[in-house]
């Protein structure tokens, strides 16, 4: 059997490096689930990966610096002959997009949240030398109706547009800790002058209780004994379903 055929059958390797908050941790595990389902081999050490995906944070200056340092460090691994590409995802990538691409030649691609549903396809294109159009930032608050109660319907109708790009997908745990985050919602409707999160994370949207409970059971089956709830604004949970007591009801299931 030729070495070419062997290489074609060998799984491609990817490392996910996560910076920032627990929300990014859940995003990374959902990306890992998508990649594993498509046959990618997940490795812990970026030096062992053909492609390093850096899940960046863009909230405060120190977090931005950490993200930039991580991208530069990942780029330096190309000298080892294993790492072929460095990809930025996450909040800083979403928030700055084209600006980050202009300033960071160390990255081979900067992907948006909208690319998450096709993450395997995107990484395959990049690793094969193809080019991905650089993400152009937009105000994600405009992607859903202003009235929260209209969002549950619009979300279901717009699944093809992947407004909530991760939705319900199998997570793949990236550690064996007995404690794990559980995402209950995305985005925020607050307009705090010091916070840009609604601009790049979008308007508030709750996950359906059935989805949350299903994922909680899955985490328990995988050795998790303690969960902590994650969202940009937990106190708003359920308002887009017209029920601010939805948390109380869910916990009584």
Region annotations inferred by a language model:
Residues 1-237:
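Proteins enriched for Cys/Gly/acidic motifs involved in redox and nucleic-acid/cofactor modification
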Residues 238-244:
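Short glycine/threonine-rich loop-to-helix capping motif typified by GTGT followed
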Residues 244-253:
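Alpha-helix-loop-beta-strand connector modules within alpha/beta enzyme cores
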């Amino acid at each position: 059997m030729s070495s070419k055929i062997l290489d074609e059958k060998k799984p491609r390797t990817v490392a996910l490096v996560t910076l920032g908050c627990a929300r990014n941790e859940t995003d990374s595990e959902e990306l890992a689930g998508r990649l594993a389902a498509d046959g990618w081999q997940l490795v812990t050490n970026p030096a062992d990966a053909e492609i390093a995906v850096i899940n960046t944070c863009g909230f405060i200056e120190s977090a931005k610096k950490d993200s930039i340092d991580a991208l530069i460090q990942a780029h330096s691994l190309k000298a080892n002959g294993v790492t072929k590409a460095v990809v930025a995802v996450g909040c800083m990538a979403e928030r700055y997009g084209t600006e980050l691409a202009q300033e960071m030649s160390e990255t081979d691609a900067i992907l948006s949240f909208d690319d998450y549903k096709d993450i395997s396809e995107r990484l395959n294109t990049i690793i094969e030398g193809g080019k991905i159009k650089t993400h152009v930032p937009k105000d994600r608050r405009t992607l859903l109706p202003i009235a929260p109660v209209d969002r549950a319907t619009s979300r279901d109708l717009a699944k093809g547009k992947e407004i909530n790009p991760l939705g319900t997908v199998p997570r793949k745990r990236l550690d064996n800790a007995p404690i794990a985050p559980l995402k209950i919602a995305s985005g925020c409707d607050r307009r705090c002058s010091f916070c840009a999160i609604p601009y790049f994370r979008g308007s508030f949207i709750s996950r359906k209780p059935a989805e949350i409970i299903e994922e909680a059971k899955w985490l328990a089956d995988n050795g998790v004994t303690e969960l902590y709830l994650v969202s940009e604004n937990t106190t708003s949970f359920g308002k887009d379903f017209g029920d601010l007591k939805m948390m109380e009801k869910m916990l009584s299931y």
